[in-house]
């Protein structure tokens, strides 16, 4: 996975011409100019983590990814535009006080773990049909949860899925261990969540669902 950059916008815009993808993601169609503006806005927003998922079988890793986010080296990005298969996002917010579990109330409030009452909405899209039903969405989502647990100290993950999107519902429930916490009848939309308590490791959170070898991996820039 790599940060969402301007070079990715045209392909992303092509994806979002699909009525099915617009409906599944709850998105509105944008012009190409608006898509570029949205990319810049999301990149500058500290409450959003947005990454493009690359399929390993189509990815030319080259010598290094260390300069992936540098203006001096765009070669990796341009070389792998055809490996783009989808995107994964985290939208960060603070939990409402009534939504914080008893276990989370016991969290320390020091600066080091001030995010322990934060939550993240998870949004995953595998846009290319050739990349679907291969487990890439599960792996990308697991990787983002592992990163957010280890580095952002997120206490609650949740997602909202249309009731007729059975593959996504099965992935979050059966493959990732999310549980249903709400249903909005007016939107015909389920909400699922995965909570952690103080001290939970990612292994405890995801159990056997932790993936040791990913088809897609995170750019080192995630940790910068």
Regions flagged by a language model, labelled:
Residues 44-45:
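Soluble sensory domains of the PAS superfamily and closely related sensory modules
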Residues 20-23, 50, 200, 222:
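Amphipathic alpha-helical interaction segments
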Residues 14, 23, 37, 41, ...:
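Charged/polar, solvent-exposed surface patches and flexible loops
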Residues 3-29:
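Helix-loop element at the rim of GNAT/NAT acetyltransferase active sites that forms part
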Residues 19-41, 55:
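Conserved GNAT-fold acetyl-CoA-binding loop/helix
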Residues 2-4, 8, 15, 61, ...:
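Acyl-donor (CoA/ACP) binding surface of acyl/acetyltransferases
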Residues 50-56:
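Cytosolic beta-strand hydrophobic patch enriched in CBS
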């Amino acid at each position: 996975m790599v940060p969402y950059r301007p070079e990715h916008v045209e392909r992303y815009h092509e994806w979002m011409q699909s009525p099915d993808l617009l409906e599944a993601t709850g998105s509105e169609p944008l012009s190409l100019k608006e898509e570029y503006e949205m990319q810049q806005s999301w990149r500058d927003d500290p409450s959003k983590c947005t990454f493009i998922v690359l399929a390993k079988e189509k990815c030319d890793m080259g010598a290094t990814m260390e300069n992936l986010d540098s203006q001096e080296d765009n070669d990796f990005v341009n070389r792998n535009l055809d490996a783009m298969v989808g995107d994964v996002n985290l939208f960060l917010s603070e939990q409402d006080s009534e939504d914080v579990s008893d276990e989370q109330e016991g969290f320390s409030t020091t600066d080091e773990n001030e995010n322990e009452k934060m939550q993240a909405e998870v949004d995953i899209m595998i846009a290319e049909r050739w990349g679907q039903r291969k487990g890439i969405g599960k792996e990308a989502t697991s990787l983002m949860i592992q990163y957010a647990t280890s580095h952002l100290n997120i206490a609650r993950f949740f997602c909202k899925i249309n009731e007729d999107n059975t593959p996504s519902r099965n992935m979050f429930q059966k493959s990732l261990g999310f549980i249903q916490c709400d249903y909005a009848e007016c939107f015909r939309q389920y909400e699922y969540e995965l909570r952690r308590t103080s001290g939970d490791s990612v292994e405890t959170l995801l159990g056997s669902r932790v993936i040791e070898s990913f088809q897609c991996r995170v750019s080192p820039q995630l940790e910068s």
